[in-house]
Amino acid sequence: MRYNEKELQALSRQPAEMAAELGMRGPKKGSVAKRRLVKLVVNFLFYFRPDEAEPLGALLLERCRVAQEEPGGFSISFVEDLSRKYHFECCSQEQCQDWMEALQRASYEYMRQSLIFYRNEIRKMTGKDPLEQFGISEEARFQLNSLPKDGRTTCIGSQLNVLD
């Protein structure tokens, strides 16, 4: 995917849903964990040097997996290349759990699946389609049959490193 660098930098300045200094290690073999300011903004995970305002890079959180690593750590790997894995070290297991949950909720796919679930629950309770009033109830992206075959909701990301 191609992104406008200025737009990404502007997005990185928006209020973060979560932000913290974490240890971060990239996917290259032999890479060492470095302290990075990590900010979750919508479905992008930006990372910065702690003393700089411009991001070093960003990860687009679509079609990726978040996994628990050693205690107090987690990783993000991408479906199209599972060997490309970013490792993060938190101050506590609680902080690690908070980050993992927030990252899993950040993807468009997770939000879409949640919308479909609640749409069907409302339809069962009221007998009415809540999206009908907006004229979008027949769009494919809002249909249950457009969900992945395995029904998994843990797949959340794709990568983006354009701000180097």
Swiss-Prot record:
Residue stretches making up the PH domain: 15-108
InterPro entries: Boi1/Boi2-like, PH-like_dom_sf, PH_domain
SMART domains found in the cross-reference section: PH
Pfam families in the cross-refs: PH
Protein name per its UniProtKB record: Pleckstrin homology domain-containing family J member 1
Organism the protein comes from: Mus musculus (Mouse)
Source lineage: Eukaryota, Metazoa, Chordata, Craniata, Vertebrata
Gene from which the chain derives: Plekhj1
